[in-house]
């Protein structure tokens, strides 16, 4: 039995402002130098490993530094996603319009990647870039090795088929069940690599 409670977090940690700016520009369809984005993501990864170690995190991860957002990165790895749609506002934003306005004001002060207008399913879903997940894992392993920090455990995140199905509207499949089944097959690639 452990003599203390191990500390961890949900996975996504704040990204540097410059990196967020690159992700925001890319998410809005702007031109982004891929080499610059990749280098900024790797730099942020190394920094976030150090931050977790220095702040006593026992179970660490890559902070999702090399992804623009928790599930939006899948548009670069899965076929069949495209276009945009506007997700309905969350219940707390409907119940508290003053809070919604404050969130909107804060978002206008800095670059942000919004998950409120994600892509939708417009074709058959399959995983087409396993090498991107493999590279993310390799970068994390390299950062841990080079930085030399020892954590009790480490992990990487991947979204569930359910959150992707709920967030990325189906405009292709005959049923949500069929959409969910193909998402599960595609995301299994990520799970097995991780």
Residue ranges, per PLM feature:
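Domain-level signal for soluble alpha/beta catalytic cores
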Residues: 1-193
